[in-house]
Amino acid sequence: MTTTPPDRKDVHVAVLMGGWSAEREVSLSSGKECAAALEAEGFRVTRVDVDPNLAATLTALKPRVCFNALHGRWGEDGCVQGLLEILAIPYTHSGVLASSLAMHKEQTKRIVAKYGVPVAEALLVTPAQALADHVMSPPYVAKPIAEGSSVGVVIVKEGANRPPEAIGRIPVTRDNEIMVEPFIPGRELTCGVIGDKVTAIIDIVAAGHLEFYDYEAKYAPGGSKHILPAAIPGHVAERVQRHTLAAHKALGCRGVSRCDFRWDEAKDQLVFLEINTQPGMTPTSLIPELGAHAGMSFGQLVAWLVADASLNR
C-alpha cells in the first residue's frame, strides 16, 4: 500500500535563522532566501529568528518540519539539533553527532584522516602560547577551532618576525584553545554532497585585493569568482570527489555538506581544509550553485531538504 504525500500547503515549515553567533547576518540572508523559495514551492512557512526562547516558540508553532538555516555556534554544532530531537520535530541537514564533530575542526581532521582524506598537521594552543613566539615556522594559519565563514582566521606570512597581535582576538574554545596549521598554497577547491551524490567541483578565485577566501570573499558581491566546473586534471577531480564523499560519510552527515580543499598545482598536493554541514544558502553561496549545475533549481533543492527531514539523524 502506498501513501500519498501531503499537499505542500499543509506542510508547515519553520525556517530557523539568525540566532546570536558571529554568523548571524549570513544566517538571516540564508534563511530569507530559503523561506521565500519554500513559499514559492507551495509550503506554509514561518520565519523564526532564533533566540533563547526557541523551545517555547516551536512548541506554540507546532511545525511539521524545521528547516535549519542557522550558521555557527548553537545552530551548526549539535545544540539546536539536540533541542529538535527532544521536541520531536523533524529537521533538515545533519544530526547532533555529525554536527558537533564537524564543527570542531581538529576532531574532524582526526576522523577523516582515518578514512584516507589528506589533512595538514594541526596544533591546539592557547592564544598566549601563539602570541609568545611562533609555534610553527611561518607561513601558517591561526584560526578558531569552532567557527565558520572564515571568522577569526589570521594568516602569518613567511618571514614574519613575531606572531601578529590579531591572534589574541581569535575566538577560543571552552579550553581556551585555538588551532594553528601550516599555510597551504594553491587553488581553493570546493565540492558538495547532496543526499548521497557528490557534486561537481568549483575552483574559487578570491578577488585580487583579498589574501584568501575569507568572509568578504564568501559573501560580498564580487568577492570571489566561481569556476564551475573547475578546470583541473581528471585525477585531481576524482580525488576531491572521493575525499568529499568519504568525509561526509565518516562524520555521518545528512542532507547536504560541502568540503573545502587546497590544491598545490606545482606539487600536485591536495589537502582537506574543512567540512561544512550547514553550507550557506545566500545568492552567492556554493551549494545552490552546485545544485543548479546538476539540474536542481534552488526551489527544488530546498523542497528536497524538507522532504529529507527526519529525526534520529
Give, region by region, the residue ranges found by the protein language model:
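Short beta-strand-to-turn element immediately C-terminal to the catalytic PLP-Schiff-base lysine
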Residues: 125, 153-159, 193-195, 273, ...
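ATP-binding N-terminal substructure of ATP-dependent carboxylate-amine bond-forming enzymes
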Residues: 1-97, 101-103, 107, 114, ...
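Active-site nucleotide/adenylate-binding loops and adjacent lid/helix of ATP-dependent enzymes
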Residues: 2-17, 45, 58-60, 101-187
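Conserved metal-phosphate-binding beta-hairpin within the catalytic cores
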Residues: 182, 248-283, 291
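Phosphate-binding site of ATP-dependent enzymes
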Residues: 162-242, 269-271
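Short, flexible, mixed-charge acidic loops at enzyme active sites
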Residues: 80-85, 212-220, 277
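C-terminal active-site "lid" helix and adjoining low-complexity regulatory extension at the edge
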Residues: 3, 269-313
